[in-house]
Amino acid sequence: MKESIAKVYRKTGETEIKSEINLYGEGKYDIKTGIGFFDHMLNLMARHGLIDVKLEAKGDLQVDSHHTVEDVGIVLGESFKKALGDKKGIKRYGTSFVPMDEALASVSIDISGRPYIVCDFNFTVDKLGGMDTELVEEFLRALAFNVGITLHARVLYGKNNHHMIEAVFKALGRALREAVDRDEKINGVMSTKGTL
C-alpha cells in the first residue's frame, strides 16, 4: 500500500496545532495535546486504524479543554481530507463494532463528501482525566465536518465511562481503516455520480 501523507498547521487565538498523518501507516503515534485522557484516546484511534499520527497541540487549557479538543478534530479532519486526495479506489464505507470489557460501541463512516454526524451515547460522569465527556461528540463533529464524512457513533451498552469512550475511539480507528482501504477492482470512485 502506498503512503498517503498530509501535513496541516493551524494557529488561532486559542490553539496552535501541527499534525502529520499517513493514512496507510502502521499505527505509529506521537500525540501531545496537553490532555492525557484525550491523548490516550487518539493513540488508540491511530493504533487500531493503522494510521500514523504525529500531532502537537498547544491550547488555552487554563480556560478548559473545549477549544483544544475541537480544534484537534478540525486539524485531523483537514489532514485526513488532504491525505485522501481524489478518493479514487477507496472502499468509502467502514463499520466497526468494538467491545471493551462490558461496553460495546459501533462507528459507521461514509466518505461521501457530505458531512453529517449522529451520536448515540450517554456518559454518566462529566469528566475523565481532565477532559469533559461531552467533548467526545465535539471532537467527532469537528473531525467529520472537516473530512467531509457521514459518521454514526453509538455505545450500545456499558457501565464504565472510560471503557465506553475507549470502545468508540477504537471503533473509529477501525472504521476509518476499512473506509480508506483501497480496492484495485474499484475503477474511479465508489459512486454512480462519479465524484465523492
From Swiss-Prot:
Keywords: Amino-acid biosynthesis, Cytoplasm, Histidine biosynthesis, Lyase. The keyword Metal-binding does not apply. Disulfide bonds: none annotated. One of its GO terms (molecular function) is imidazoleglycerol-phosphate dehydratase activity. Signal peptide: none annotated. It comes from the Bacteria. It catalyses: D-erythro-1-(imidazol-4-yl)glycerol 3-phosphate = 3-(imidazol-4-yl)-2-oxopropyl phosphate + H2O. It is found in: Cytoplasm. Its EC number is 4.2.1.19. The keyword Amino-acid biosynthesis applies. GO terms for cellular component: cytoplasm. It is an enzyme of class 4 (lyase). GO terms for biological process: L-histidine biosynthetic process. Pathway: Amino-acid biosynthesis; L-histidine biosynthesis; L-histidine from 5-phospho-alpha-D-ribose 1-diphosphate: step 6/9. NCBIfam families: PRK00951.1-2, PRK00951.2-1, PRK00951.2-2, PRK00951.2-4. Belongs to the imidazoleglycerol-phosphate dehydratase family. This is Imidazoleglycerol-phosphate dehydratase. It comes from Clostridium botulinum (strain Kyoto / Type A2). The lineage of its organism: Bacteria, Bacillati, Bacillota, Clostridia, Eubacteriales. The gene is hisB.
